[in-house]
């Protein structure tokens, strides 16, 4: 029975697991959309949501402590700046639910269930091609 088991282990040591989840969180915040396996996407969702909420709270209070807290958690000052500067403004009126998980079939090599995890309300840039045929 799996009573009181909070997180997935992914067959890794705890240091490797935390490093992997941290890298996935940083990639998601940086690119705003990543493709990964479904269990990994489900596992990083609460971490990313908490990071965005921390950025929102400390942006409103205008405290330096918030940026230091984010840097201590994610070890990347550029991502902390993006959380406080861009994402906290984008999600100012939203109370949670900053991410979306879309199932994306199965991986060809090992049939692992794949998913796309993305930040909602993101700017989608479209490139129009000039066809003069």
UniProtKB/Swiss-Prot annotation:
A cellular-component GO term for this protein: cytosolic large ribosomal subunit
Biological-process GO terms, alphabetical: translation
InterPro entries: Ribosomal_bL17, Ribosomal_bL17_CS, Ribosomal_bL17_sf
Keyword set, alphabetical order: Ribonucleoprotein, Ribosomal protein
Gene3D superfamilies documented for this protein: Ribosomal protein L17 (3.90.1030.10)
A molecular function GO annotation: structural constituent of ribosome
Annotated Pfam families: Ribosomal_L17
Complex and partners: Part of the 50S ribosomal subunit. Contacts protein L32.
Matching NCBIfam families: L17 (TIGR00059)
Family: Belongs to the bacterial ribosomal protein bL17 family.
Protein name as it appears in the record: Large ribosomal subunit protein bL17
Species whose genome carries this gene: Ehrlichia chaffeensis (strain ATCC CRL-10679 / Arkansas)
Species lineage: Bacteria, Pseudomonadati, Pseudomonadota, Alphaproteobacteria, Rickettsiales
Gene symbol of the encoding locus: rplQ
């Amino acid at each position: 029975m799996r009573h009181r088991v909070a997180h997935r282990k992914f067959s890794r040591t705890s240091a490797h697991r935390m490093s992997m989840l941290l890298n996935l969180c940083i990639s998601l915040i940086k690119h705003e959309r990543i493709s990964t396996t479904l269990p990994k996407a489900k596992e990083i969702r609460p971490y990313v949501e908490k990071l965005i909420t921390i950025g929102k709270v400390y942006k409103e209070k205008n405290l330096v402590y918030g940026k230091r807290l984010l840097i201590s958690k994610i070890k990347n000052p550029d991502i902390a700046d993006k959380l406080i500067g861009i994402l906290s403004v984008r999600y100012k009126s939203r109370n949670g639910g900053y991410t979306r998980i879309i199932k994306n079939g199965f991986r060809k090599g090992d049939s692992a269930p794949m998913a796309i995890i993305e930040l909602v309300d993101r700017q989608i840039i479209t490139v129009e091609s000039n066809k003069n045929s």
